[in-house]
């Protein structure tokens, strides 16, 4: 059933002159989202990737920076001090970067000085122990999505792009769905409905009964 809706959302949505994302809207029910412990806040690695380039920034010592060949941006501890004095520039960077990674010894300083900017955006850095190679973590982040409900019963999660194959989108959908269901007290019973759409297209309801067997 899910495969049918993925195919339909492509066929029924007019192609645009830019790379459209495909996202799902998840509507919860019977969940007390006023309790932060009940909220969905997941970072999920998509098995088929995002279908587009994501930007990852690394804040670390020079030693770690040299190992992270796949980081899109690299910053030093001194750069953190500069950002403290120029928060406007850092806000622009935070909006442009999808994920931050930081050497664990810098996390306290980053949280204290830049947490007010990164926290609300859900972009608190992922810590890496000193001396460790962050390459694999960065690679996974480039294939990851965030699923965050906050205190709202409806939230949205991208599962790829229109140019991806139906099979790749299906695999990504199943991964996101199963992770979210695993975090709900009643599992599928806490899902009211799920819709899928392209960036500019109309939403189509997804039937997930075959995933709950």
Swiss-Prot record:
It comes from the Archaea. Keywords: Repressor, Ribonucleoprotein, Ribosomal protein, RNA-binding, rRNA-binding, Translation regulation, tRNA-binding. CDD domains: Ribosomal_L1. GO terms for cellular component: large ribosomal subunit. Coiled coil: none annotated. GO terms for molecular function: rRNA binding; structural constituent of ribosome; tRNA binding. It holds the Pfam family Ribosomal_L1. One of its GO terms (biological process) is regulation of translation. The keyword tRNA-binding applies. Binds directly to 23S rRNA. Probably involved in E site tRNA release. Part of the 50S ribosomal subunit. HAMAP family: Ribosomal_uL1_A. PANTHER family: 54S RIBOSOMAL PROTEIN L1, MITOCHONDRIAL, LARGE RIBOSOMAL SUBUNIT PROTEIN UL1M. Belongs to the universal ribosomal protein uL1 family. This is Large ribosomal subunit protein uL1.
